[in-house]
Amino acid sequence: MSKPVVAIVGRPNVGKSTLFNRLAGGLVAIVENRPGVTRDRLYRDSEWLGRKFTIIDTGGIEFVNENTSISAQMRRQAEIAIEEADVIVFVIDAQISPTPDDDMIAQTLRRSGKPVILAANKVENFAKTELYEFYNLGLGEPVPISAVHGMNIGDLLDEVVSHFPEDIEEEVDPDTIRIAVVGRPNVGKSSLVNTLLGEERVIVSNIPGTTRDAIDSAFEHEGKHYIIIDTAGMRRKGRIEELTEQYSVSRSLRAVDRSDVILMLLDAGEGVTEQDKKIAGYAHEAGKGIVLVVNKWDLIEKDDKTMNRFEKDIREELGFMQYAPTLFISAKTGQRVTKLLDLVDFVAEQNSTRVATATLNTLVREWVHLNPPPTDKGRRLKVLYATQVGVKPPTFVFFVNDHELMHFSYRRYLENQLRSSFGFEGSPIRMIVRQKDEERE
């Protein structure tokens, strides 16, 4: 099941980014008063009472300065919050009376029909703070908090989680591969999905997704079962086309959460953009299998070196995703689209690969012998043994004499050796380093 989405909204300088950091468990978001900064740290995952969720910081919303381009952009971010959120946290400044912007935001949120929690921030004295003025916003009882000091955040999270949709697991055959097609607007997601489904004559059914607005297409190919999670299919009637690219990120997050393999679409005419990096980064952190799909290849003037140059550029821009295979296609003409499902099968298998402990440790000893760890102040790292503890993604624990001696370069060396020996193409690898005395913890 995809994680619920919690959007933090409010006018500028009420403490949204500070609250965002609190709810994200201290993960770094840039906190400044300069417009646009928080857009670089738009989303993070968090957990409370066993429920995982995604937090979105929408930036400051202003209605009073309605003629400025910045204000218009912030209002579009309000639309993003309304469209995407399961729960909205409306942050206000408890130290001043409600402003006209607060009133306008409250009106917008009331019309949304979504659960809205009013978070009265910057409360210094919980016993003496009067919040009766904020009842006029029509959003119920304010929850007093101090994001800076972390006070009453637990009560706020209790309220947030109480509004989440029921946590119901999907009933899907374990052998079915769930494919998420993600990417920026107009990169060709719908065309690719239509081409894939158009070529596969045995469409089994349309399955309502666990998100409230997704329709998943189930089909068979050569006796194998697939479900396409189509983010492009999440478009609603209205003004969705006008929303900013943050909306596409948020839609993609939901698809990524529910997938086994991700088809990350890139536009051959534009290369890798900052928005592409955000989506790819989330896919990498989620531990899913991934294929980089360069679409609109038919529109590119080419020579015999064009493909190699383009792939090199991708590797430079997405340096953290060197393991992902790349396929150049045209969803419009069908060029190489038939190869996609074979690649999906391969990547799904790689992401589920298990390595026997005895085999792994024999190789680890060889790797350490070939390239001994460097010393640090006279002390040398000793890799005692290793074991695989999970798949999707493949996850390994390395027990060592002192985890602080594991330099990132040696960690990278071990990961490269794992890939050289066992493949894991299209799959991230998780490495956990523990001291021997941590084994029993």
Curated annotation (Swiss-Prot):
GTP 1 binds at residues 10-17, 57-61, 121-124. Residues 353-437 form the KH-like domain. GTPase that plays an essential role in the late steps of ribosome biogenesis. Associates with the 50S ribosomal subunit. The keyword Nucleotide-binding applies. Residues 4-168, 177-352 form the EngA-type G domain. GO terms for molecular function: ATP hydrolysis activity; GTP binding; ribosome binding. InterPro entries: AAA+_ATPase, G_ENGA, GTP-bd, GTPase_Der, KH_dom-like, KH_dom-like_a/b, P-loop_NTPase, Small_GTP-bd. Belongs to the TRAFAC class TrmE-Era-EngA-EngB-Septin-like GTPase superfamily. EngA (Der) GTPase family. This is GTPase Der. SUPFAM superfamilies: P-loop containing nucleoside triphosphate hydrolases (SSF52540). GTP 2 binds at residues 183-190, 230-234, 295-298. GO terms for biological process: ribosome biogenesis.
